[in-house]
């Protein structure tokens, strides 16, 4: 009779230098030799801007079948997974799903909360992809995997609604063998304005009910630094936001760039608008998708405040004295695409978030000026928007807008800093309190810090050391044995960490290549230093985005150059002066663009 063993491996999420790309696999083999595997999350990581890639994803070649989009051949997975559990709808946890489907990967059956399920299904529909199989699960639901594994869903709190943790219990000889709690991203400190909040009682109960000889918990390490700010809470965040609006009564256009899926933070704008007795407009495709997913999931918390017409009618509505536009683009999506693709005179139709269009003065309806107050409530995070975020805000300020921002990892342009929202992740104090209670319930608990770079994971270890909780630090692709009362590194051949990354290519006079108007997405295999190894395939973009109907991309280049402290790449200085062939190509591109825009009038980017 074989010896049972439970193995945990992180395909992404414990990276060497930045947060994201979260993905883990639990594999269990019982004494009869039955093996089952399950996966948790499949997210994206924001790659450094200088890499030329937009984002990267964990390499799942071992776990998913793939149908090559070029020749149609099916490549079988060597270690197929039975199910994929999704903790929540943020990009660093689900961001690979659409792109891997485009690359030909066959996704396994998925399990997710109502909101996460609805959001993913809507996202696939907007990309013209087949709607994936996703089973809705809620706290307390138990999913059986084969004859030797089960997974129970647990409510947790985060900045996105309907977040779940998953408690996996494996069996050997019909008795519990090992348990692993995957919290996803979570916080414990306050009541959430929308949906369910973290329940200590429920959380501790699952550990007590389903005790195992070896129990491990994966801990979100994003905000466990000892110098992290104290949380101000939802009510204070609303107070601070409202006070800034009231201090600037001469500015009747309020613009708030947000992370579209962070519903708990969008609720700050919604409550501020209620106090102002005004309506908000949700501008951006993904914000509208989030609203639709909320309604499908039974959340109508914002409906009394959200304007029901078009943005044109909203801006022209004289009954609304102070306009409040909540827009996509807190991470300046699209600005990096512009820098990677467009030369001085190019007119490529690059998809841009609503906030970036405003910064470039390319938004068809919203024009910034001295009447505008920009509430940059999402803090600057160096690993995500450390370059593009400050550029976007400074470009907005150059148009006359006043910018107020939440303090982050860097100050920008001398803008006033006011704490207008909290991190969506548990801080050091709250984690220490929670894990002390977990240890009281499960004395042999072992912590595995994840969702952080090595320094952040060390901070979590320091917290655990203070309360006597054993900790095991790990890295991507290290195989961990969970059993015999401990977590140990398994002895197995180690392969180098690699990712699949994507970049977008748009029509550009500076490349000798014909590119469709909507552009191409190239998929590459890259190493852990974000250097390209090989090109995998390229896919034509869904014909949904188009260039703004007013303004010129030529002016965008000048705006970037003029804004303060804005480094830009040397390749972007080139012009077509003196090059008749290049000038002709640019002219032809402009004519083609005008023709296509007339055909697509009224359709704007994400």
Question: What are the functions of these language-model segments?
Answer:
Residues 88-93, 158, 421-428, 451:
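Histidine-centered active-site/metal-ligand motif
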Residues 2-83, 90-275, 279-284, 289-307:
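His/Asp/Glu-rich metal-coordinating catalytic cores
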Residues 160-163, 170-237, 336-341, 348-366, ...:
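Active-site-proximal loop/helix segments of hydrolase catalytic cores
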Residues 229-377, 382, 390-392, 397-399, ...:
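Hard-cation-handling environments
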Residues 7-11, 17-18, 537, 542-549:
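Extended recognition/assembly regions associated with phosphoester-bond processing machinery
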Residues 545-552, 556, 562, 570-577, ...:
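Non-Sec secretion/translocation targeting segments of pathogen effectors
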Residues 103-114, 121-140, 144-150, 173, ...:
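Non-globular, low-confidence helical/coil segments that flank catalytic cores
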């Amino acid at each position: 009779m074989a010896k049972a063993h439970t193995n945990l491996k992180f395909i992404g999420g414990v990276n060497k230098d930045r947060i994201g790309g979260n993905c883990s696999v639990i594999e269990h083999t019982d004494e009869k030799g039955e093996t089952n595997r399950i996966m948790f999350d499949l997210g994206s990581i924001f790659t450094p801007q200088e890499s030329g890639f937009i984002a990267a994803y964990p390499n799942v070649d071992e776990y998913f079948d793939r149908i090559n989009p070029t020749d149609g051949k099916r490549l079988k997975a060597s270690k197929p997974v039975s199910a994929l559990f999704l903790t929540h709808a943020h990009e660093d946890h689900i961001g690979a799903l659409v792109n891997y489907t485009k690359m030909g990967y066959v996704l396994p059956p998925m399990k997710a909360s109502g909101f996460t399920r609805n959001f993913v299904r809507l996202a696939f529909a907007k990309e013209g992809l087949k709607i994936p199989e996703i089973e809705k699960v809620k706290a307390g639901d138990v999913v059986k995997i084969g004859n030797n594994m089960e997974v129970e869903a647990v409510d947790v709190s985060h900045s996105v609604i309907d977040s779940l943790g998953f408690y996996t219990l494996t069996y050997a000889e019909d008795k519990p063998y090992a348990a692993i709690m995957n919290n996803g991203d979570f916080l414990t400190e306050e009541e959430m304005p929308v949906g369910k909040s973290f329940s200590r009682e429920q959380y501790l109960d699952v550990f007590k009910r389903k005790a195992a000889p070896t129990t491990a918990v994966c801990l979100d390490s994003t905000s466990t630094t000892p110098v992290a700010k104290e949380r101000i809470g939802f009510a204070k965040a609303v107070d601070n936001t409202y006070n800034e609006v009231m201090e600037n009564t001469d500015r009747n256009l309020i613009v708030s760039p947000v992370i579209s899926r962070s519903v708990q933070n969008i609720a700050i704008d919604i409550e501020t608008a209620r106090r102002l007795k005004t309506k908000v407009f949700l501008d951006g495709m993904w914000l509208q998708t989030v609203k639709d997913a909320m309604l499908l999931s039974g959340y109508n918390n914002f409906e009394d405040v959200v304007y029901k017409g078009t943005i044109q009618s909203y801006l022209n509505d004289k009954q609304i004295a102070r306009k409040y536009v909540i827009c996509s683009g807190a991470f300046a999506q699209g600005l990096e695409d512009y820098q990677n693709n467009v030369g001085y005179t190019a007119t490529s139709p690059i998809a841009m978030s609503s906030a970036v269009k405003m910064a470039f003065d390319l938004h068809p309806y919203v024009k910034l000026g001295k009447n505008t107050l920009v509430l940059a409530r999402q803090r600057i995070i160096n690993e995500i928007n450390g370059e593009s975020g400050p550029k976007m805000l400074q470009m907005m300020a150059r148009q006359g807008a006043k910018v107020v921002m939440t303090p982050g990892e860097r100050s920008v342009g001398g803008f006033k800093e006011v704490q207008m929202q909290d991190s969506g992740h548990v801080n050091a104090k709250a984690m220490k309190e929670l894990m002390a209670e977990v240890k009281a319930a499960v004395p042999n608990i072992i912590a595995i810090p994840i969702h952080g770079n090595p320094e952040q994971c060390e901070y979590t270890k320091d917290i655990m050391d203070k309360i006597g909780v054993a900790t095991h630090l790990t890295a991507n692709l290290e195989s961990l044995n969970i059993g015999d009362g401990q977590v140990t590194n398994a002895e197995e051949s180690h392969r180098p960490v690699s990712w699949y990354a994507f970049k977008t290519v748009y029509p550009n006079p500076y490349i000798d290549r014909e590119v469709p108007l909507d552009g191409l997405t190239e998929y590459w295999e890259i190493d852990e230093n974000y250097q390209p190894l090989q090109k995998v395939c390229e896919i034509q973009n869904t014909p949904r985005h188009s260039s703004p109907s007013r303004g010129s991309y030529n002016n965008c280049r000048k705006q970037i150059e003029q804004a303060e402290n804005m480094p830009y790449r040397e390749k972007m200085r080139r012009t077509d002066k003196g090059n008749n062939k290049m000038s002709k190509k640019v002219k032809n591109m402009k004519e083609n663009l005008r023709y296509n825009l007339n055909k697509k009038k009224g359709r704007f980017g994400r």
